[in-house]
Amino acid sequence: MSNRRDFIKKTTLGTLAISSVLGVSGFAANHENEPEAESKEKKQTKPIIISTWNHGLPANKESWKNLKEGKSALDAIEAGMKIPEADPNVRSVGYGGYPDREGKVTLDACIMDHNSNCGSVCFLQGIKHPISVAKRVLQNTPHVMLAGQGALQFALSEGFKEENLLTPESEKDWKKWLEDSKYKPVINIENHDTISMLMLDQEGNLSGGCTTSGAAWKMHGRVGDSPIIGAGLFLDNEVGAAAATGLGEAVIRTAGSAMVVELMRQGKSPYDACKEITERIYNKHKNHKDMEYLQVGFIALNKNGEYAGYSLRSGFNYAVSDDVKGHRMEDAKFKMAWDK
């Protein structure tokens, strides 16, 4: 099984000053890791939950528990995503997430239901559970997205508690980065750790959510793909759902998740849809300044319960939960292998 941290370390930009919390590796380009035809799609009965990365597994388990207890899909997604948001050892989400270059922890999240209702927050500070605030945006406002101070004001009006999210461990790593990098915008080992979750519930309805603290040491005010409906997350209940992880700028440039769903609408399988959009991102970025450290991954789930994951580079894995095989991790297929 691929190790998520090893994978993230290999996305680091090696030409910049490297601190002790960073890792570097090269890659071997154009290595196609094509699966056998029968393994391209994993067909399942509903319900089914898939989410990105190892820390998606405890999120899945909590969501599954809530779903089996009769909670709504949105409530189940919220409950699951709150698990990594509250875990200080997950340095890419919520409490304990790595800060921006100013030492501020800023959070992004979104959530979407089967009726295409959605809520989102970005550049939110001081609130441990942005997924819950995003859900309140969906439920209690006429808007889709609230940002920055406005998102914070809304959260406080909804009864959320403001608190310091910068843990001593994350602060220590940030200060080390400042010292070693001389304030250069280094891509950090924990940069690409968005938790994205997709769900097909007992009634056959789709929903999804994303939560992240974004790119470590990012410029203050930077927002990635995760809170953007159509980039980090998209679903159409008649077709399927998709979500992204990786370098948000690349996903935004291609409206990644929306394009995966549109390809499924045209008859593509979840695997083929994820693969085609990943190839599109590669073709648009192969001569781009981001390319030497670019990594993106997608997960997709269609109305029939077929699911898949695919990434540009090796190491991406995702959690799957269903009644057939229980809770487990699966490795995504990929286009390019990293050198060892």
What are these regions (language model features)?
Residues 26-28:
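Boundary at the C-terminal end of the N-terminal hydrophobic targeting segment
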